[in-house]
């Protein structure tokens, strides 16, 4: 584990003991004011269907310290209720108000700017039902708006519809930009990969992307939980989404090396993706609570 001063252009090459002390000092500067641990899920608290070792105890320690845990995921293949069930199945704990997904951010965005508009949602049936329950007027033909989610039930017919609607000029919203989804053996194609496919066929880029690292999701979280940016720490394994999300919204940031990013990658990050602190895993924060 090590600490990176944001006024420096690179990661200081210091001993493990010095790095630990520097990290502890950095955390102590702001950890006491934190009210919400905003946690990425894939690669941060679990990988695939396996929780990262010690995670149940770590989450319990965070809650016992008086902080709130909020699971913040770009993965729009599941509903909030499905995430609660997944957490329970793998031995972790989560309640409905502790889950915030890019789909939820997208529903809020649609209700703010496109209320009563006809919306085509390319998503799993469960996620489409979540959009409908959120007040979105779903349609399969002639939409005003198209939403591209992480559809693990994707078919050619759905892609053809999306392409046709985009070429006709529908507003184009993507839930999030991730190219791949972490998995134990081979990463899976995610919404970013679908975006590239549709770019080739339609010539369109999303007009708006709602999930991390963008401010649509950050503003929604601040409004939902009634906190200020400096009272949130974003913890995740992806610098270009999780850490940049924190930077874009004024949150504190912790990069964990339990998922997509290894120590070598963490040493060569651009300024926009540089975290306050790097930890091997979320478990390492317990001693500072």
Task: Please place each PLM-identified region on the residue numbering.
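Short, positively charged and aromatic/hydrophobic N-terminal segments
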Residues: 3-6
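Asp-based, Mg2+/Mn2+-dependent phosphohydrolase catalytic module
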Residues: 15-20, 24-41, 46-65, 81-100, ...
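Conserved phosphate/oxyanion-binding catalytic-loop motifs
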Residues: 75
């Amino acid at each position: 584990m090590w600490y990176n001063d944001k006024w420096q252009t690179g990661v200081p090459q210091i001993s493990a003991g010095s790095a630990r002390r520097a990290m502890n000092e950095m955390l102590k500067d702001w950890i006491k004011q934190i009210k919400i641990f905003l946690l990425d899920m894939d690669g941060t608290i679990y990988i695939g269907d396996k929780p990262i070792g010690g995670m149940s105890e770590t989450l319990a320690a965070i809650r016992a310290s008086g902080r709130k845990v909020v699971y913040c995921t770009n993965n729009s293949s599941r509903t909030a209720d499905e995430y609660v069930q997944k957490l329970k199945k793998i031995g972790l704990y989560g309640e409905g108000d502790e889950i915030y997904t890019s789909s939820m951010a997208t529903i809020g965005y649609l209700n703010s700017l496109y209320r009563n508009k006809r919306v085509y949602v390319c998503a799993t049936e469960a996620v489409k039902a979540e959009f409908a329950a959120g007040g979105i007027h779903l349609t399969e033909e002639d939409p005003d708006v198209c939403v591209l989610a992480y559809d693990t039930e994707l078919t050619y017919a759905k892609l053809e519809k999306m392409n046709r609607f985009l070429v006709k000029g529908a507003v184009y919203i993507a839930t999030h930009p991730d190219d791949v989804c972490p998995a134990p053996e081979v990463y899976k194609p995610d919404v970013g990969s679908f975006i590239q496919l549709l770019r080739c066929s339609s010539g369109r880029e999303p007009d708006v992307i709602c999930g991390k690292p963008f401010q649509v999701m950050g503003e929604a979280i601040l409004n939902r939980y009634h906190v200020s940016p400096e009272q949130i720490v974003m913890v995740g394994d992806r610098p270009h989404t999780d850490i940049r999300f924190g930077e874009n919204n004024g949150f504190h940031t912790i990069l964990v090396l339990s998922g997509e990013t290894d120590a070598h990658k963490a040493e060569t990050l651009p300024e926009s993706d540089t975290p306050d602190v790097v930890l091997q895993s979320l478990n390492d924060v317990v001693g500072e609570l």
